[in-house]
Amino acid sequence: MFKEFKEFAFKGNVLDLAIGVIIGAAFGKIVTALVDVVIMPIISIILSLILNDVNIATWQFSIGATPIMIGVLIKTIIEFLIIAFVLFLFVKGINSTRRKQEVEAPAAPPPSEEVLLLREIRDSLQK
C-alpha cells in the first residue's frame, strides 16, 4: 500500500501540481505586498490630489451597522488583475515554446516505393 501511494505521490503530474500550488501561494503573498505597499499608496496619492485627502484602503460605507468596505474590494480586484496578467504571460510563453517545438519536429519521410508496392499487394490480397 505504501509503495502504491509512493508511486502515485511522486508521479510527475501530482508533484508538479503540488509545486505549482506552493509557488502560487508564495506569489500571492508577493502580489499582496506589492499592492498594499506600492500600488494602493500611489493610487491614493493620485486620488488625493483630485479628491482631497482620500485613502482608498479605508473607503467604506455602512448599511445599518454593517460596514461595506469598498477599498478592500478594489485592492482585491487589483491583486486579481496582476495575478491574471502574470499567468497570461506565463501561458503565452509556454504556448509559443510548444509551437516552436512542433514546427521544429521533422515530418515523417514519405514511404518508399517498395512500401507503396507492398501496400498495393496487401490491399489486392484482402479483396
Swiss-Prot record:
**What are the protein's UniProt keywords?**
Cell membrane, Ion channel, Ion transport, Membrane, Transmembrane, Transmembrane helix, Transport
> Which PROSITE patterns does the record cross-reference, listed alphabetically?
MSCL
Bilayer-spanning residue ranges: 8-28, 30-50, 70-90
Its subcellular locations are: Cell membrane
Task: State the membrane topology.
Answer: Multi-pass membrane protein
Q: What is its main location?
A: membrane
GO-annotated cellular components: plasma membrane
Please describe the quaternary structure of this protein: Homopentamer.
Which family, according to UniProt? Belongs to the MscL family.
What's the protein name?
A: Large-conductance mechanosensitive channel
